[in-house]
Structures are given as C-alpha cells and as structure tokens.
Amino acid sequence: MAEDKISAAVLDRLYATVQARKGADPETSYTAKLFHRGTAKIAQKVGEEAVETVIEAVRGDKAAMASESADLLYHLMVLWADAGLEPAAVWEKLAQREGTSGIAEKNARKS
C-alpha cells in the first residue's frame, strides 16, 4: 500500500534527522537540547506526549490526537537514538508479533 511506504519513509527520515542533530548546538536545535538534558528528560517528554495523546483520544479530537501522536513519535525516536536503539529493532519485534494473538503473545513473554 502506498500510504504504508510513505509512512515508513517519513519515520526513517525523522530518525535520520534525530541522529544528525545529536551533536548539534543545543542553543539552536531542540533535538540537541533534549540530548544535552539527558535520558531522564527525554523519557519525561515521551511520557508527557503519551498522556497528551491519550487525552485527545478521550476527547475525540482526531486532529489534535494526530498532532500529539506526531509529537509522541518524535520524542520516542529521540529516546531510541539516545539509547542507541535502531528503529529496525522495534520493527523486527512488531514483525515477530504480527499474526499472533495479543493474549498468546503476552503469555509467551511471561514464560
């Protein structure tokens, strides 16, 4: 599906941009500023954006939810880059779980 490819390409470009800004000047780059402030601050921002996304979902505001979801994905990618986690590792986990019942998959992780 063309939309899937566009979405994947956007995420790949976003992660590449995040990585490229890792060493940028924190005075001129918000991404660099997050890296400079450290993992705890990045994780806090991920949590804040997750809560804001959930609030918009409960409110039923799809446009605001899309905006907050974009913020959440951005901050999540900053957290991944900070931890040295490549998106491919996450995509691999998702692919492994594809077609598996959520309950069965969760039970398999417990063993």
UniProtKB/Swiss-Prot annotation:
Keywords: Amino-acid biosynthesis, ATP-binding, Cytoplasm, Histidine biosynthesis, Hydrolase, Nucleotide-binding. Its EC number is 3.6.1.31. One of its GO terms (molecular function) is ATP binding. It holds the Pfam family PRA-PH. Pathway: Amino-acid biosynthesis; L-histidine biosynthesis; L-histidine from 5-phospho-alpha-D-ribose 1-diphosphate: step 2/9. One of its GO terms (cellular component) is cytoplasm. It catalyses: 1-(5-phospho-beta-D-ribosyl)-ATP + H2O = 1-(5-phospho-beta-D-ribosyl)-5'-AMP + diphosphate + H(+). GO terms for biological process: L-histidine biosynthetic process. It is an enzyme of class 3 (hydrolase). InterPro entries: HisE (IPR008179), PRib-ATP_PPHydrolase-like (IPR021130). It is found in: Cytoplasm. PANTHER family: HISTIDINE BIOSYNTHESIS BIFUNCTIONAL PROTEIN, HISTIDINE BIOSYNTHESIS BIFUNCTIONAL PROTEIN HISIE. Belongs to the PRA-PH family. This is Phosphoribosyl-ATP pyrophosphatase. It comes from Azospirillum brasilense. The lineage of its organism: Bacteria, Pseudomonadati, Pseudomonadota, Alphaproteobacteria, Rhodospirillales. The gene is hisE.
